[in-house]
Structure formats: C-alpha cells, structure tokens
C-alpha cells in the first residue's frame, strides 16, 4: 500500500512541475528550457561556439551522395578479384550438397550453375 501511495505522490509532483513550467511566460524561456536570467553552467556550450568549431573542422570524405571516396576504391578492388565459388543462392558450386537437402544434379539439368562458375567466358561460348 505504501509503495502505491509513494508512486502516486511522485506522479502528482511531476505533473505539478510540468504544469507550472508550462504556465511560465514564453519570454522567460529559452530554446533549451533555461530561463534567460539563469547563468550558464561551465559545461554548457552555446550554439555559436558549436558552429565555430564545426566550421574549423576539415571537410570529411563524404560526398554529397553520402558515400566516401574510400568506398569507391574498395568497390574497384573487389571488382578485380576473381569470382568466388558461391552461387547467387549461397551454395558452393564445388559442393552442391553443402546444405544437405539439395539433390545432386548434373550440369545439363541446371545450366545456370555452369554459367555462374565460368562467368563471362562461358556466356561467350554459349552464344557462339
């Protein structure tokens, strides 16, 4: 019973504080809820100082599209690597039964596996 009563008292006090804060005239409030006559504390940094600090920072690597220049370099490097043995379904071409439920199939019944394995060269052979 006492716990319930103390929770009710805390909620009423909080509601009263919010009500009193809302009743203050807007001229005494600042953007951050601090009154204009209160002195700023030592750890409070004003917006003007923050804007000056951000203006002093060197520009970041991000472009206007949100990508860094380093990301484009990584894409070029990954494009130079040889294709992996994984197919687009996440199974290895070298071991088609790696998941355990897939039946063993021949290359004739599933021609896309050979295309993925050999990449562009096989597509050129198939076109000729």
Curated annotation (Swiss-Prot):
Positions of region (Disordered): 27-128
Family membership noted in the UniProt record: Belongs to the NPY family.
Record's keyword terms, sorted: Amidation, Cleavage on pair of basic residues, Hormone, Hydroxylation, Neuropeptide, Pyrrolidone carboxylic acid, Secreted, Signal
Functional description taken from the UniProt entry: Has a role in inhibiting host-seeking behavior during a reproductive cycle.
Gene Ontology molecular functions: neuropeptide hormone activity
Modified residues (Pyrrolidone carboxylic acid): 23, 56, 80
Protein name: Head peptide
Compositional bias (Basic residues): 115-128
